[in-house]
Amino acid sequence: HQGVHDVLLGSTTLNLVHHTDLPVLVVKRPAEGPYERVLVPADFSERTRSALNLAAELVPDQVLRVLHVYNLDALDNVLRNRVERSEVDRIKADVRAERQQELDAFLLNADVHPDRVEGQLRMGYAPDELQAAVDEWDAQLVVMGTHGRNRLADALLGGVARRVVHQVKGADVLLVRS
């Protein structure tokens, strides 16, 4: 029954997200009181900014963790057996530094006081790294921005949102339209 439940949950939730401008909360755990540990996955877009702003309003006295995950598997595949390992490591370090600068700039330009946000950068497959971050920090809520009414963008995001709604365990998920 869990598989059917997950399919219905995902399709119903995403259908609701597509037809309302209101945030949609998917409750996945028993309530333990107000949210204290809130995680915001970040791709540095306007939708992430909207999610971060709403998260800051929801938990005005808590620090928010903003997570950016990047993946270098394609780079590894292209460079494997073509470039010295030390050069691959240097390129990866450069990419990490660039992503860190992007995260720092995003947080600096956010509408949330810098003392209220904490950035975290992880390399890997985004759904797995998001779950690992939820587990490590014992996050209670994941606040994720979604696209507006653009059909192609909605279709693309639908896959990401669907994976987050289905795969994140141990935390509620709040989907926020930008």
Give the positions of each predicted feature.
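Gly/Ser-rich helix-loop-strand patches that form or flank binding pockets
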Residues: H1-E32, A133-S178
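A short helix-to-beta-strand connector/capping loop
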Residues: V112-E118
